[in-house]
Design a protein with these regions (language model features):
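Helix N-cap/beta-alpha junction loops of NAD(P)-dependent oxidoreductase domains
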Residues: 99-103, 151-154
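Active-site loop-to-helix junction immediately N-terminal to the catalytic Tyr of the SDR YXXXK motif
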Residues: 107, 153-161, 173
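Alpha-helical segment proximal to the catalytic Tyr-Lys
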Residues: 132, 176-180
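Residue(s) in the substrate-gating loop at a strand-loop-helix junction
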Residues: 147
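Short-chain dehydrogenase/reductase
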Residues: 2-86, 100, 110-111
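Active-site helix of classical SDR
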Residues: 127, 163, 171
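Substrate-binding pocket helix/loop in short-chain dehydrogenase/reductase
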Residues: 103-104, 111-116
Length: 187
């Protein structure tokens, strides 16, 4: 029996990379996994399905949900479906993130908006959708993936740095609003 047996974890941006590693680790500790990722083509859809099968092979229930985490209404619908499918959401990991690096003087508005929408707005969207569920359950954890760049900045990454600084402030504020029932750390 693992540390997370009987729990349901929702991990955003988990078809690959850090999100996949988090989902795999939680599954190895017994958590059932719901994960999301953006699917724009057949290769991405195949990656989503391959990750689902890999996680499920660890002996837990796993479902993959394709969608745009930066879309508020789509996120609300996805979380409602996940809650219906699993019966609870005990852990939310806000991992979805991108970079579109460039010096600020050359950065387009589209580069700025894309990074802030995926990295910060998606976290707000999922927190907004999952918080009522966790409060009704009287427990939960919302883990936010931050970065040292959000504290110190980084040349060529003003959009990414701003998104991660926002993530840090969001986590601190949400921890004050939802605590002590819901634990809200940032990594």
């Amino acid at each position: 029996m693992g540390l997370l047996t009987g729990k349901t974890a929702l991990v955003t941006g988990a078809a690959r990379g850090i999100g996949k590693a988090v989902a795999m680790k939680f599954a190895s500790e017994g958590a059932n996994i719901a994960f999301t990722d953006l699917v724009l083509n057949d290769d991405m859809a195949a990656g989503l399905e391959a990750t689902r099968k890999e996680i499920e092979a660890l002996g837990v229930t796993c479902r993959a949900y394709a969608g745009n985490a930066a879309d508020f209404e789509e996120t609300e619908k996805t979380v409602k479906q996940i809650h219906a499918d699993f019966g609870s959401i005990d852990i939310l990991v806000n991992n979805a993130g991108i970079t579109k690096d460039g010096l600020m003087l050359r950065m387009s508005e589209a580069q700025w908006d894309a990074v802030l929408n995926v990295n910060l707005k998606s976290a707000f969207n999922f927190i907004h959708a999952c918080s009522p569920i966790m409060l009704r359950q009287r427990s939960g954890s919302i883990i936010n993936m931050a970065s040292v760049v959000g504290v110190h900045g980084n040349a060529g990454q003003c959009n990414y740095a701003a998104s991660k600084a926002g993530m840090i402030a969001l986590a601190k504020s949400i921890a004050q609003e939802l605590g002590p029932r819901v634990f809200v750390p940032m990594l």
